[in-house]
Structures are given as C-alpha cells and as structure tokens.
From Swiss-Prot:
Induction: By serum and phorbol myristate acetate (PMA) stimulation.
Tissue: Widely expressed at low levels. Highly expressed in melanoma cell lines.
Cross-link (Glycyl lysine isopeptide (Lys-Gly) (interchain with G-Cter in SUMO2)): 517
Crosslink (Glycyl lysine isopeptide (Lys-Gly) (interchain with G-Cter in SUMO1)) position: 379, 517
Region (Disordered): 1-22, 135-237, 380-416, 502-525
Family of this protein: Belongs to the NAB family.
GO biological process, one term: myelination
NCD2: annotated span: 267-356
Record's protein name: NGFI-A-binding protein 2
Region (NCD1): 35-113
Gene name per UniProt: NAB2
Main subcellular location: nucleus
Amino acid sequence: MHRAPSPTAEQPPGGGDSARRTLQPRLKPSARAMALPRTLGELQLYRVLQRANLLSYYETFIQQGGDDVQQLCEAGEEEFLEIMALVGMATKPLHVRRLQKALREWATNPGLFSQPVPAVPVSSIPLFKISETAGTRKGSMSNGHGSPGEKAGSARSFSPKSPLELGEKLSPLPGGPGAGDPRIWPGRSTPESDVGAGGEEEAGSPPFSPPAGGGVPEGTGAGGLAAGGTGGGPDRLEPEMVRMVVESVERIFRSFPRGDAGEVTSLLKLNKKLARSVGHIFEMDDNDSQKEEEIRKYSIIYGRFDSKRREGKQLSLHELTINEAAAQFCMRDNTLLLRRVELFSLSRQVARESTYLSSLKGSRLHPEELGGPPLKKLKQEVGEQSHPEIQQPPPGPESYVPPYRPSLEEDSASLSGESLDGHLQAVGSCPRLTPPPADLPLALPAHGLWSRHILQQTLMDEGLRLARLVSHDRVGRLSPCVPAKPPLAEFEEGLLDRCPAPGPHPALVEGRRSSVKVEAEASRQ
C-alpha cells in the first residue's frame, strides 16, 4: 500500500532542523539579555511571570510601565483587557489564563513567590515596606474559567467586584476612612476619566504658591490634591512629608527618560477627548501661574473632580501622598499626564518610600516630640515600680506588711511597687529585677513603652515567685508562721501578705500536725 509522503519528506534533508536552528539564535540572546529586576515592583512582576512561565513578556511589561502587580489584581475587566492588549497578550487567551492563575496565587499565598532571582544585586532592590507590599495581600478574585464556547474576553476577565473587594484588602497603607478605593484611579486615561473640567468638586489653589521664576518649588503644597475641595487640614500633607515626596521624585526623575513632543502629538491624536481635556496644558508657558494648578487638577490619581467618590469620604495619607507624587512627576514631565499607568506606578513607588522614611523618622523621635504628657506619665509609672522606696517612702514597719488580697486575680491586677518592695524586703537582700528609670530607652513610641511596661510586670511577678521559693527554706527556720488554713493554691500569692516574716508552708505544718494526731489515735487504739 502506497503511503502519502509526509510534508517533511518534500523538504530537503535537514531543512526542518535548519529552520528550527535559525530560530534559536533569536530567542537565546533575548533571554540572556533580559533586564533583571531593579525595584521591588519589578521583582514581584518577575516572580509572577516566572510562576506563570511567561517571562517572555517581562520586558514588554516593564516598557509599558506595568511593574505593579497589585495594579493587575485591582484592574477591572476593561482595564485588564487593555493591559493585556498593551503587552501583546490579548490574542493569546491561554497565556492570559496562566497569568490570572499566577495573580490569584500571588494574592492568596505570596510565600510561593519567594524563590531567589539569579544574579540580582541585593543593593539594587529598595526594601521599602516589603512586609506590607508582599506579605499581607489577601483577597478573592474570580477564577476566570469559562466554557469552551465562551468568547475569549470572558475567559480573561475578573469578577466585577474584584476592584472594590481588593481595594479594601490590598491597600498598601490602610489608614483612614478613605484608604484604597480603586474606583478613583482609571488605569490608562479613558474617556470617562478625562471628561471636561467643572463639576461640584473643583480643586482649590495650592497653599504653597510657586516662585516667580516658574520652576518647580521644593516645598510645593498639596492643597490642590484633594478633589473634595474642602481645603481643610485633613486633605493636605504636612510640609515635611511634601519635602520627602519632592526629594524622592527628584531622585527617581534623574534616571527617568523624558517624553518628547512627537510622543505627545501621537497620544493626543489617538484620544480626542483626552486632547480636549489636557491638550491646553501643553500649550501653556512654563512661567504661567495657572499651569501648575491645571497639572495638579488632571494629575490627581485619587479623588478626581470627575470621579464618583462617596460624599464626605476623605482621602487617606497614602492617597494624598500618591496624588502629590503624581503632581510632582507631571510638573517635571508633562507627558506623564497622558501615560497614567506609568504615572501611577511611579507615584506608588514614591509613596512607599516616603511613608517608610516618615515612619522611620517618627520612630526615632523623642517622647517630647511625639506628645509629651501621655508618655511622660507612662514613664513615671514605670519609674515608680522601679524605685518604689524613693517615690513612696515607707512610713514605718507597718508598710512591710501589705494588706491581704483574697484572690489571685486581684493580686495580679494590683501588682504595685509598694507590695513588690515589701515582699522583696521581707525575703531579704534580693537583686532588683528592673533597671532604673535612667536605663529605660527614651525614644520608644507609646506601644513600645506599653510593651516594656507589661514585660517588666511579668518579669517582676516571675522573679518574685522564684524569690519566694528560694527563700522558703532559708527563712523558714527563723520565724515560723502558722496562720489560718489557706488553700494550697493561694500560698504563693498570699502567704507573705498574711505574716510579717515568711515561714514554712502552712499545708506542710498542718500535714505534720494531722499525721501526729493520726499516729496518736492509732497508738491509743
């Protein structure tokens, strides 16, 4: 029976192998020359794509500014499809499914993505808020699976509730009532997000006006950031925080490629509504005082004037920081007004760094700078427990006999310096278990002092118990004390409270008496 020749048989010998060999030199150099992660966001993106076996898209994501994995998790259906189209993955639904699966794993179990990246210099990855950006992400997303007959769009779509749910759970700094509302950031500049100006929520003028030279001031305020337009204190950043944001933006901007006029023209031609809303900014002179206000108005990420934010919902510190960073970036490069994905990623990086530096500086402040009265009062309470004989001198020998407390709970709750000092003096010369007030660190925050306070009480309680056990045999022979018959469980906490000098165990004394009585009765019988 004659067989039909296979398609490879008609090719010249080695033709298929040579064709496959010609493809290899094109792929291997790109894999070898692939840029390694330089920031925390790029490292997270690298690990997610590595988990999904989609590292070929890594450079495309970086070139498009998609170095924020949380942005992919928070994206809605339309935004996610747009991102997939930007990186060239929209025509490959299987790749999209693999990416969705990796994103779900990253959101639910970030520990799976802790494998090291080869040849990554440790000093090149800024470790700002790693535990917060990589270790506490929790949320639920739809599985993205559909029947084979469904269109490709449904296969790579998240549930409609995923942006709202993840906005509450994946916010990098959940502080304040308005933390993490992803509805306000529209991803790329969509027509809905760049509608004409106006509306009820008009941005106010910045409190820190720019200098007459027209340059970007270092202390530029954030009054025009909040779209709520209240102009009050809650919608403004502190000048020190603004200074940190400006310094971080300038440091990142030194290595940031600036856009050109050709890019602006092409982007404005692609989006007519965007051109009508922000096109006039590119025609304004740099010395124009209104240019900064317009840039702040249209560079806002959270709380835009055309967003559907709940009335009365204030912006959190994290959102205000992102808005200020976005304004600073756009004032240095106006083309970022047209590339909101990249602008959002850069602003988040600045917000993480600035918040970390602010919290680090706050932890090093002295108690007087953090709110003197509460910390001083707490420090005084700790000092009273460390030196009770100085703060409260005993009036006489009666002070060495603290009043009897009937229960263990009351004794533990009212463990004061007076009762502790009385017990220690009754036992004998015992080394002090707590350092003097001069040894206490003065730069601890309130929660640190409370932790030290609780730790000292625990150590004093444990040391007191050990001191009683050690001194029991030592002082038992000197002054035996035979009080009423207390339960055995109350001995350790109540024996020294009942007698001036500790004595032998009451249960042992009573046991000896009962044994003698039993022997006497037995001998009589």
